[in-house]
């Protein structure tokens, strides 16, 4: 980490000096690998990386190129945040890079085990990160109620640009806008201090849909069916692994799109990008504005007014879309993908269950989502120990569906009888607070 830190800081400082003095500089280190293919279009992630690239030759870059990019949103997780703060101190960094639009320090992982160690360490972490310029889940002076919301759910709410790059200290850092990557504490520290990150441009797998989702199905079933049909088509090979899933469901709003992108972490994908239509992206940005405003109303904005700045940027992005100045992100028609895959919605006619094969001879496959089954497989004989609705993929529409199901059972039988405990909880306060309801509905492609 130390060698990487020194190299990154040296490159950044020289680049800043050259930009300020408007002078060209000769390279000190060997140039990064650049792959540029003539007459080949760009995938969505290639477009984002080219737009945010720093210090390149100026050529159009394709997958496999190693690129230094500017980062828009950064998230620090509370269990690794102390290491991030130590690494920032090692850099002698005292304030967040002006390149970063917004950054958030979570408190979600330690909230569930608020033991004596957490009670000693987390307030100290929140104070450091607040002073550094981050929006913090817990206020160092206890001016607002602790925000124990799931980190990547919050990052999804504060991402306000479909061309953004997001770095987060959590494996589920997958957004419905832009492209997001989970990262270690050192990479998060570098992103906070320099506003940059370095990584190769990943290959992409294009996922499109045909047919119509049946009105009694849930979008989560489409998510599981995507994996089921993909594994079937590619003879059990997970073509998503280590790659970008570029998903084309242009009418999905932020919450449902996040259900898909968040799930891609379980399929070992590097990241995921949602391609949205104009109207859908505008509505998703308005949802983000509403949720950021809730955070402002709670008193979470800082002296730099980071949260208000995000709302201002969202308004600017909406104006760009409406005027046609900068349409929503789309890949080029002649972009090259590692694989292309079409999900058939017409054949999804019953709920799909992810059932990890914990007895698989291959240890690496015991706790993955490689085993997807239709609910009829269990013939009503599967024993349920616990029901839990409240993962990071859950949104308000899901909770409303559960409420309707329980009301229907009560109307039919006079009461609701549970054969196992059922836990229902919202992954974020914003899920409950925000008035916009995103009910899952059938969609046709």
Residue ranges of model-derived segments:
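N-terminal amphipathic, basic-rich helices that act as targeting or association modules
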Residues: 28-98, 254-258
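Flexible inter-domain linker/hinge segments
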Residues: 15-44, 311, 317-320
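Mobile "lid/hinge" segments at catalytic clefts and subdomain interfaces of large enzymes
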Residues: 171-283, 291-293
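Long, structured ligand/cofactor-binding scaffold of large enzymes
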Residues: 64-198
């Amino acid at each position: 980490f130390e060698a990487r830190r020194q190299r990154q800081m040296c490159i950044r400082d020289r680049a800043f000096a050259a930009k300020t003095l408007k002078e060209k500089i000769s390279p000190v280190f060997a140039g990064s690998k650049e792959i540029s293919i003539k007459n080949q279009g760009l995938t969505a992630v290639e477009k984002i990386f080219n737009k945010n690239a720093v210090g390149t030759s100026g050529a159009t870059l394709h997958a496999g190129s190693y690129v230094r990019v500017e980062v828009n949103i950064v998230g620090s997780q509370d269990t690794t945040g102390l290491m991030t703060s130590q690494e920032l101190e090692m850099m002698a960094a005292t304030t967040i890079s002006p390149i970063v639009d917004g950054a958030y320090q979570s408190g979600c992982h330690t909230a569930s085990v608020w033991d004596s160690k957490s009670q000693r360490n987390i307030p100290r972490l929140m104070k450091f990160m607040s002073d550094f310029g981050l929006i913090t889940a817990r206020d160092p002076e206890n001016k607002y109620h602790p925000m124990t919301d799931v980190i990547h759910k919050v990052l999804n709410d504060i991402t306000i640009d479909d061309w953004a790059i997001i770095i987060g200290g959590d494996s589920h850092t997958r957004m419905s806008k832009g492209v997001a990557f989970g990262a270690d504490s050192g990479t998060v520290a570098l992103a906070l201090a320099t506003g940059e990150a370095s990584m190769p441009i990943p290959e992409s797998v294009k996922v499109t849909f045909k047919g119509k989702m049946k009105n009694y199905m849930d979008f989560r079933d489409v998510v599981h069916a995507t994996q089921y049909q993909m594994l079937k088509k590619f003879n059990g090979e997970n073509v998503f692994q280590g790659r970008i899933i570029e998903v084309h469901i242009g009418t999905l709003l932020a919450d449902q799109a996040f259900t898909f992108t968040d799930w891609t972490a379980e399929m070992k994908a590097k990241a995921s990008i949602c391609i949205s239509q104009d109207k859908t992206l505008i509505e998703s940005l308005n949802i983000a504005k509403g949720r950021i405003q809730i955070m402002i109303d709670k008193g979470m904005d800082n002296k730099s007014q980071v949260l208000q700045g995000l709302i201002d940027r969202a308004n600017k992005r909406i104006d760009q879309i409406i005027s046609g100045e900068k349409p929503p992100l789309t890949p080029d028609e002649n972009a090259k993908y590692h694989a292309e895959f079409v999900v058939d919605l017409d054949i999804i006619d019953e709920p799909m269950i992810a059932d990890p094969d914990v007895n698989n001879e291959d240890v690496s496959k015991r706790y993955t989502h490689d085993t997807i089954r239709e609910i009829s497989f269990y013939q009503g004989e599967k024993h349920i120990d616990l029901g839990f609705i409240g993962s990071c993929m859950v949104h308000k529409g899901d909770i409303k569906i559960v409420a309707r199901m329980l009301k229907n059972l009560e109307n039919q039988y006079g009461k609701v009888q549970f054969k196992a405990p059922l836990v229902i909880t919202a992954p974020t306060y914003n899920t409950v607070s925000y008035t916009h309801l995103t009910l899952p509905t059938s969609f046709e492609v």
